[in-house]
Amino acid sequence: MLEVLIIGAGPTGLYAAFLAGLRNLKAAVIESSAEPGGQLTAVYKDKYIYDIPGFPKITAKDYIDGQVLQYERFKSDLPIYYNEEAIDIKKHDDHFIVTTTTKTIETKFVLIAHGGGGFVPQKLKIDEHYDNILYFIKDLNQFKDKKIVVLGGGDSALDWAIDLSEYTKDVTLVHRRDEFRALQSSVDHFREKGTILTPYIVDTVEGNDKLVHTLVLKHAKTHERLNLDADYIVVNYGFVLTKSRLDEWGIEGEKGLIKVDYTMKTSLDGIYAAGNGIDYPGKVKLISTGQGEAATAIQSITTLLYPEKTRKFEHSTALIKE
């Protein structure tokens, strides 16, 4: 039986796993996607993060790679199971039975670090699947000297358009409104590098062999049509969270966020939570605060598991011997 099961392998869950290993807890992690990193991997892999302590800037990928390397000190005794979603959590005597996609796991404590749920991109409304219509970007080098169309008007759409313009001179941003939700400075920056078409919506696509070669755009006001050739279409209409199971699990929350106390305990004894999926007075959604919450949760769980031990928090310099 596990002492703690961590749900989620984003920056908060990975740090919780490292801390659990540091304290010799019998633990495991389940992650609903195929790789670690949560939202950072799903949405911002090649983007720079500027608010991580100690890093003036670092790409999301490099940061998560560093976290995985930090965790791997304990990976032989603390596995991460990918493509495993937490479907049900039930109390049984003095422990919990957690049902996942393919497993049944018994654990004394649960730490939820799922960031509020999985992120699903809002799709372009077309009937066919095309291989060059993308909702995530994993390698910017694939776009070198290609014709790129970016769809969207938010900060992420503008960020991608700006980043892509470093790899090709042919980037067109299409937005359905004249006004942008993105920062005006980003709009002005991209306007110097690429083409902006507003207010246009995608009417149809033309393609063959699973590849789009032409977008047919329709002007939102005049209904005039415009054909736009493209090698790749990058869609950034935003993301929606998958449905929360909090109610099914009996965990108190509001608007999909888990309510916790100062120890990071939820409304159910034995279940703790940390990261962007929680709420309490003064909560700030930052990677660093989520990791601090993970430290609090792991310390709370450790104290309950081993009450005979000191409550003093031991630092890594005392716990790791090279």
Swiss-Prot record:
Q: Which organism is it from?
A: Acholeplasma laidlawii (strain PG-8A)
* Cofactor binding note of this UniProt entry: Binds 1 FAD per subunit.
Q: Supply the enzyme class, top level.
A: oxidoreductase
**Record-linked PANTHER family:** THIOREDOXIN REDUCTASE 1-RELATED-RELATED
What are the names of the required cofactors? FAD
InterPro entries linked: FAD/NAD-bd_sf, FAD/NAD-binding_dom, Fd--NADP_Rdtase_type_2, Ferredoxin-NADP_redctase_2
Keyword set includes Lyase: no
Upper lineage: Bacteria, Bacillati, Mycoplasmatota, Mollicutes, Acholeplasmatales
- Keywords in alphabetical order, please: FAD, Flavoprotein, NADP, Oxidoreductase
Q: What's a single GO MF annotation on this record?
A: flavin adenine dinucleotide binding
Q: Which family does it belong to?
A: Belongs to the ferredoxin--NADP reductase type 2 family.
Annotated FAD binding lies at: 12, 31, 39, 44, 86, 119, 317
Its EC number is 1.18.1.2
The question of whether Flavoprotein is a record keyword is answered with yes
Oligomer status and interactors = Homodimer.
Listed under catalytic activity are:
2 reduced [2Fe-2S]-[ferredoxin] + NADP(+) + H(+) = 2 oxidized [2Fe-2S]-[ferredoxin] + NADPH
Which SUPFAM superfamilies does the record associate with it?
FAD/NAD(P)-binding domain
What protein does this entry describe? Ferredoxin--NADP reductase
